[in-house]
Amino acid sequence: MADTKTATPATDAEEATATPPAAAPSSEAYAIVEASGTQMWVQANRYYDVDRLHAEVDETIKLENVLMVKDSKGTTLGQPFVKDATVALKVMAHRRGPKVIVYKMRPKKKTRRKNGHRQELTRVMVESITVGGKAIS
């Protein structure tokens, strides 16, 4: 006969201190910014691809259109933007996105048109997120 183990119920103190394994750490600071006409969730020391920016490689750009900031103190929501909040981006490279095929056809006619498109992108690294002159990450 196989050994069977019975689970012991957790106490209230154990349940309060236990965290689920898939939960992200709450100390991670992030911001939601508006860049190139889109809203992006950004974190420090990560890179993102945005629509082409008019900036040279290794140039630093400051985004002031910060919609929301989350840090260890809490969440700050802008109406529409967070006051005195900036995100510093460093341009890593200019590149092109994957090719998208556009195919137009009229049925029962000999009209067919095939075009390809590659979006011009800029890869940026988030250097810092600052609120009120203090870097939160």
From Swiss-Prot:
Residues of the signal peptide: none
Record keyword Iron present: no
Stretches for region Disordered: 1-26
GO cellular component: cytoplasm; ribonucleoprotein complex; ribosome
Keywords recorded for this protein, A-Z: Ribonucleoprotein, Ribosomal protein, RNA-binding, rRNA-binding
GO molecular function: rRNA binding; structural constituent of ribosome
One Pfam family in the UniProt entry: Ribosomal_L21p
GO biological process, one term: translation
InterPro entries linked: bL21-like, bL21-like_sf, Ribosomal_bL21, Ribosomal_bL21_CS
Disulfide bonds, paired cysteine numbers: none
Family to which the UniProt record says this protein belongs: Belongs to the bacterial ribosomal protein bL21 family.
Oligomer and partners: Part of the 50S ribosomal subunit. Contacts protein L20.
Functional description taken from the UniProt entry: This protein binds to 23S rRNA in the presence of protein L20.
Record protein name field: Large ribosomal subunit protein bL21
Organism: Parasynechococcus marenigrum (strain WH8102)
